[in-house]
Amino acid sequence: QTGGKYVLVFGTYFIYILLQTLFTTRSCTWADKPYYGIFEDLLLDFILIPIYVVSLKEWLTPRLLTRFLFLFCAGCLLLNIYVIFDLVGIGLFTDTSSAINFLYANRLGGNKLDFLGGNLYLEPQTLYIALTALIAYFLIFIYRNKGLKVFLGVMFLLLTLFLSFTVTKAGILAFILGFGIMNFYLFMRSSFRVRSAILVGIVLLVPVFGIFVFDGLKGKYEERTEEIVREVENVKQGIYAGGTIAPRVGFIRESFIHVDEFGVWGLGIYAKHRVNNWLQSSGDGLGVFTNVHNSFIHYWIQGGILGLAMIVFLFCAPFYRMFRTRRISWLICALLVVIFVMNNTCILLALNNSRLMILLLLGMFYFYNDVFWRLERGDR
């Protein structure tokens, strides 16, 4: 019954977009090209993924969840190791310093087009690295096998290193917030010995990064810091061209300029190309971009009030469920913060690289918060 109500939210939105399309195709005066791919996205991801998650009700146990989380981390680690070797090859061993500097300078390859038969964008890749780094850290305290603990510790360090290669402010900020939540929980629940180990580990982590990657990190991060300061000043002067904060402020500003077009009913199938036209004609240097870089605004433009309500529901439903059942999972809280922060700087819920996995995780957070809760209390 609960699963039916959850799926009904997305089914209602799908029907709304369908009716909206029938209405707008008859009465719309816009010359923009319609994009019908939203029906595929809604049906395959927003409806079928929650149905799949509900179907796991009889099988998902803390033990199976642990294996899923471990394999998720291992898969992300292997993918990024492949990416690194694809970028620098054996230079990682023959000239490690230059290879690391190259990875920082190129932000782990940036957006990788035609990669393994598809496209791998930097923001979704960063999201997965941040999520799996936190999960690997969490699993260190769940597994009892010392060998697995060491392996997970190495996995956590590597994933954290890979995250730093991306030089993605939102991803790093999201990771830091999630990491803080995880350590708050661990300090509350752990013994003095474990607390001491956590503190020692955190203290040692900074020097390790300083020794091995400081040169590359320093140069690229100084460049990004200067870029942020410069763009903040540009925004104050009404200049929105740039590659970090300025265009995102410009996207929000441009969206609210046209809020009368989408604020209530949304633009539906015309949203994609309509937004492109806004940016092209903005005069604020936004013409090189193609979207608003914010999932909440994206679905507000697409579905109006109902679209915005659907996205807010996605993030609020797991918290509502946890407080209602009084089974609060701190891992869920940490991962939700990561997903929320990054969706405010990129349309991750609209990209094929990330939409499916985000909806899968959000569905699991809602339906199986009790399984996460039991796992955190040692029930395996």
Regions found by a protein language model. Give the residues of each.
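Transmembrane signal-anchor hairpin modules in multi-pass inner-membrane enzymes, especially those
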Residues: 1-33, 59-66, 70, 142-150, ...
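Loop-to-helix entry and N-terminal half of a specific, functionally important transmembrane alpha helix
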Residues: 6-10, 148, 154-157, 290, ...
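Aromatic-anchored transmembrane helix interface
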Residues: 9-15, 31-56, 67-77, 127-128
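Alpha-helical transmembrane segments of multi-pass inner-membrane proteins
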Residues: 51, 63-98, 117-188, 212
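Hydrophobic transmembrane alpha-helices and their immediate junctions
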Residues: 74, 180-184, 282, 302-340
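Transmembrane alpha-helices of multi-pass inner-membrane enzymes
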Residues: 134, 179-180, 314, 332-344, ...
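A membrane-periplasm/extracellular boundary helix in multi-pass inner-membrane enzymes
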Residues: 186-237, 256-260
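Long extracytoplasmic/lumenal interhelical loops at the membrane interface
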Residues: 238-253, 257-303
